[in-house]
Amino acid sequence: MSNNNNRASIYGGLGSVGKIFGAPLLDVVMNQKSKTTSLNSSSSATNNNNSTVEEVNIPLFLHNGFKYIIQHGLGIEGIFRIAGTKDKVKQLQMQLDKGENIDYDASKVDPVDLADLMKIYFRELPDCLLQSDQYDHFISLLTLDRLGQIQKLRELVSSLRPENREMLKQLIWFLGRIAVNSTTNKMSEENLGLVWGPNLLWKGGKAVSTTDMMELMAGAGKIKLIVTLLIEEQEHVFNNLNATITKGEMKVSFINKIVGNKKTCQGISIIEDGESKSIWTADSAGIIKVFNADNYVTEREWDSNLGRIHTMTSVRDHAWIASSQSVSLWNKAGNLVKEFPGFHVSLTPVYSHGEYRIWAGTDQKITIFSSNTLEIVQTISIPGQFIVSITEIFGESNQVWVGATGGQIIIFDKTTGEEIRKLSTPAKRNITCLTFHKYMDKGKVWAGSEDKLIFVIDPFDDYSIVQTVSHPDLLLINTLKSISKSVWSCSRDSSIRIWDSNSFELLGSLDDYHTDAVIDAILTYNNRKMRWEFWTASFDKSVCIWSVSSELLSQPPPPLLNV
């Protein structure tokens, strides 16, 4: 990803910060900060604002390493339990101690080797991260009940040296992302506590003698319980656990990445009724996976036998799936309700005739299905065009916009299905996605293209393009989502970009966790954690979850229960 390459080159100047392994944590962090200040001063003097280096409060190789393992290592069974290749791990350690900056992606570092190196780093600290003078206090908290343990953990963590506290917070946050994927990597909170405990807490300074090791082993079971508790209860132990990525009024934080798909994710939808809500994903091999929307647990998965799935959408508690062989309807229990033969690639619910109707696009036609009668109610012929994307224009316009090949957009009356007009954009290739966004005005249509451009169009007055949005790293636009006073674009370059809907400026970019095209996304409210979350599905066979906070995003009303 180009953003990662730029970041690697910027951080490259931070290489020579002195010895890392065996050095006090504070020394490493302070040397790093000094180097950062020097680099930023040089950039300012040359007016090179693009080379500003973000200040990192933990050793940089760990900061980057956490992201690298989240990108490439979450699905490795036994990550942190299995040993790395001894010579490769030693080579990495020597490079870092010589002050070399390691680009993990360019060097194709094995995540297992990096995981092993991380444990070595903490094991070689002059004093353990949890501080040996606090050993007895940590051990004694195990005599308390669960609530008392959490309260005591908060106190003890707060009393740690600032550099230790920050390092512990980021390490435990990272280990939590590993544990979320324990069904795939077999590294539960308990297993992580077992392998990490001896590296984080020991008694009497550095564990180098036989006596030290014997004492360490004697307390290993208790230390495992402490680290397990830290991982399980991290949201109650640490403040500001999830770092904010964006700036301004809207706050976005990375929460989790969930791996385990065998093929590329093709679609993601919310399936809900008055009692429950789940997130469905579909991959290119036809596998449907269902997650609990509140705790992210994988509830079930199955082979739909649909062939290659292209996209999916939902109406309440039913999923509609477009595949190489059909459009199919599934209930929340995962049962096939009905299947309509025929290849389709785009699906959108449109409210008309007192119900939601599914508009499905394919080669030279649109098929419209009733979600009430489960029948085809209309077929619209569009000779010479392939229908790639569809969106409804909310309000009084009564329009549906359709993105096609050759940069064409076709506008239909959503009640009659009659064509209203055609628009030609500057795009030479497909209009890959469309969304209607309304904030403090009548609204505008955002149209993403295969030409790496986004066109913002007035759908009410003269149908003119009011703005063309671009970015040097932007590739094919896969989906656009309207959130608050912004529009989010997901593209083939693996980044999610957030655009201000009035100024069209880039508010932020979510870069570090997907490694391939982001194909689809949904915004949902987590009732358990009481926050809005943005779920993204990617060709890297994973989904990522981000928390979204904005004063314009209010808590939704409670669902109406069936009585």
Curated annotation (Swiss-Prot):
One of its GO terms (cellular component) is cytoplasm. InterPro entries: Rho_GTPase_activation_prot, RhoGAP_dom, WD40/YVTN_repeat-like_dom_sf, WD40_repeat_dom_sf, WD40_rpt. Keywords: Cytoplasm, GTPase activation, Repeat, WD repeat. Residues 51-238 form the Rho-GAP domain. GO terms for molecular function: GTPase activator activity. WD repeats lie at residues 260-301, 303-340, 383-422, 470-509, 514-556. One of its GO terms (biological process) is small GTPase-mediated signal transduction. The record marks 81 as: Arginine finger. It is found in: Cytoplasm. PROSITE patterns: RHOGAP (PS50238), WD_REPEATS_1 (PS00678), WD_REPEATS_REGION (PS50294). Rho GTPase-activating protein involved in the signal transduction pathway. This is Rho GTPase-activating protein gacX. It comes from Dictyostelium discoideum.
